[in-house]
From Swiss-Prot:
Domain bZIP: 156-219
Purpose of the protein: Transcription factor; part of the gene cluster that mediates the biosynthesis of ochratoxin A (OTA), a mycotoxin demonstrated to have nephrotoxic, immunotoxic, genotoxic, neurotoxic, and teratogenic properties. Positively regulates the expression of the cluster genes otaA, otaB, otaC and otaD, and the subsequent production of OTA.
Cellular localization per UniProt: Nucleus
GO biological process: ochratoxin A biosynthetic process
Name this protein carries in UniProt: Transcription factor otaR1
Location of region: Leucine-zipper: 198-212
Result of knocking out the encoding gene: Results in the loss of production of ochratoxin A and the intermediates ochratoxin B and ochratoxin beta. Leads to down-regulation of expression of the cluster genes otaA, otaB, otaC and otaD.
Feature: compositional bias, Low complexity: 23-47
Compositionally biased region (Polar residues): 134-143
Keywords: DNA-binding, Nucleus, Transcription, Transcription regulation
GO cellular component: nucleus
Amino acid sequence: MEPALISPELLDGSSLLPHSSADESSSTGLSLGSLLSSSNDLSSETSMPQFEQLERMLGSPTIANHVDFTTQSTDLGFLSDPNITLSSIELTELFSIPSDNASLMPEPSRQPSPLKAPDLQTTPPATGLIDSEANPTSVPLGNSVEQSADVKQLRKKYHEKYKERNRVAAGKSRQKQVDLIELLQAEQREEERRRKALERELSQIHKELLDLKQELQHHIRIANCMTMMSHGAHMQTLGLLAQDMLR
């Protein structure tokens, strides 16, 4: 990278500053003709490539991007009037470049608005005054004590009444539970009695069935004997008839 060349006129800014003594630095006016001629010489001698080189070295935009030095600025036209003199402070403020963070807008005045309501008193009023205003007819201490005793008595009566009602309801619930348990026990005993009766009836039927089986077997044996006897008698009769026929 080639080294950037800076004009000596840029480095030497003494031509832009007014030459005045120490006691006249704050109040003495400057010759407007000499200041205007020095600014014209600076604008004619300085070229744009040198400002571009300075901008590349500094890495930030310079005044070369915003000001055209080839034409005379109309904002400085009042400097051509020889009757107008400016102090050094006014000239410094005139030619100073505002920084990036500086605000270009005028700071608003902080005068109080005429429509703003006056500030209210933030001190809280006295507690006694509030109580007296809230209760204009305050009751004595004895009446409040009696009233609280009445409230306690009514509350006690209310609780006793509902305690009694809850006690009666609990007694009824327990009695109902006892009655239900007794009913279930009675039904259980009835079912047990019926079960035992059915078991006895079943055993009796089983016994009668066994007796009927035995009686049936006895009748079968008798019937077989009678059949055999009748068959033997019939055979005997047939034998006698055969003997008679052979004679």
